[in-house]
Amino acid sequence: MDRAIRRMWMAAGCVFILLMGTLSYIQFFDTESLKDNPWNSRSLYDNYGANRGSIVVDGTEIASSVKSDDEYNYQRVYSEPEKYAALTGYFSSVYGSTGVESAMDKELSGTSDSQFYDRVAQLFSGSSARGASVELTVDSKLQELANNLLQGRKGSIVAINPKTGEILAMASSPSYDPNTLASHDGSTVVSNYEELNSNPNNPLYNRAIAGNTYSPG
């Protein structure tokens, strides 16, 4: 009987050590992967419920966050959405993010290392946290022209400053409205995405950066 009890305690001890080792590994070595996991509900609400910074062209916000009355607190809104969709991409609680929303996510969400002191200042001042705005090098008039030239056609236009490499315009046609994927209603987002994805003209396909689809000219 004593031997059986000892074995039971030894087994329990081994299980305890294994659990503690696993928890320690997760806490100290696997934190980032858990934080970045799209199925992590806490990260999901923290990320999509943040007062995200604006995307700006010529001093005008083409993507911004406005207060909402649901669990996410803030709703992402795109102005002139189809004109700038190839640049902004979308920010969706269901499908993640694309375009500048993805490439500059840490800056827009306020989580980049360069914004550490800003976060500390906000903590001590009691002001609400907000991501940084990202100002694009795009010229709104050139962007308008690019979209007009592509009207009714499949294709893309990219205008680059040859001296600096700055993107002055980037358009892809046909385009889409990223607001339809930024809704906080998951079923609505899924329905809208499936409709866009099944469209034979592939509006979600960014022809400006998708590879060697078209010859330069």
PLM region descriptions:
Residues 156-162:
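Surface-exposed patches in mature extracellular/periplasmic domains of secreted proteins
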Residues 1-156, 171-209:
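Extracytoplasmic/periplasmic proteins that interact with beta-lactams or build/remodel peptidoglycan
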Residues 209-217:
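Active-site-proximal helix/loop microenvironment
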